[in-house]
Amino acid sequence: VYWKTDTIEIPNWDRHSLLDRLEPFDPAINRELSVEMEAYCRFYGLDLWVEHPEVAYHQGYIKAERHEVMVHYFRLPESSAPKGTVFILHGYFDHVGLYTQLIDRCLGAGFDVLAYDQPGHGLSSGTPAAIGSFLEYQAVLSEVMAHVRDKIRGPWFAVGQSTGGAILIDYLLSNHHNRETSDFRRVVLLAPLVRPMGWLGAKILHSLVKPFLTRWRRVFGANSGNARFLDFLREHDPLQARAVHVDWVTALRKWVPHIESARPVDFPVTVVQGEKDLTVDWQHNLRIIRNKFASVREQRIPDGRHHLVNEAQDLQATVFNTIIDTFAE
């Protein structure tokens, strides 16, 4: 596991054969994991039953919006008086396997965790790193919630990194949620996406290439101060897409004005934002978020870059503490 050791084991699992054996998600059934699925969990450190032997781990797919969405659910025993369930929404190019440290921290703080791979990411179906419309992300979230509503414990909390944060912003604004109607009691946004950095130039480039290309090569930026994490993404993670899909940028272009013109809502959010983030236009995005939500608590991290969930250890500690403190209120 990249965050535990410098030596990365060669993955003795293969995405296609894992998918062939995936079962529907049902936390009422205790299934034995296949040897290959155990190897996948070990590769990303999702084998958290080693650190937390009392935790039950369930996984499988949910059919949502034409997709088969891979769901991971970690459940504490009743005897530990769990505080509810944290939903984790990952960012663009990410997957649940990169969020193990956050899952670990939530379990340690007494929360169950539910996390799923977005369409086009990880073990979920869909064209890699593509989406037809950001409405698909909303439909998947609402179908996942509907599927698990009677199967997992409340209250619910949510944390989203980057595009995951965008999905939560959209959920709250498009449904005009307030404190009474939202499925989530508390929401934390980590380096949330509204506009990416260099948005004007990106739109011009997109207009030029859209008639000719379906994707362009991904550049792996230094979006974290954790060199081990960056090396893992570039060199060792078999679930990393190597190209940006033009459809995703097309969808983002439609989504940004929709969010920026949305009516404000009476809901509080906590935003954690690195001031060295070169991925999103964070100053603009914070202004938009302040205008949209009744109360916005900001935790700025002066040396923080974009991938806050996988930042250098001291910065990551501040990020995780803010999340847990917000949910524990």
Regions found by a protein language model. Name each.
Residues 92-98, 121-152:
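Catalytic nucleophile-loop/oxyanion-hole region of alpha/beta-hydrolase
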Residues 267, 281-290:
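Short alpha-helix in the alpha/beta-hydrolase fold that links the catalytic acid
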Residues 157-250:
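Alpha/beta-hydrolase-fold enzymes
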Residues 1-63, 69-76:
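An N-terminal hydrophobic leader/cap segment in hydrolases
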Residues 290-307:
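Catalytic histidine neighborhood in serine/cysteine hydrolases
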Residues 265, 271-273, 277:
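Short beta-strand/loop motif that positions the catalytic acidic residue
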Residues 304-317:
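Catalytic histidine-centered segment of alpha/beta-hydrolase-like enzymes
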Residues 96, 103-127:
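Conserved alpha/beta-hydrolase
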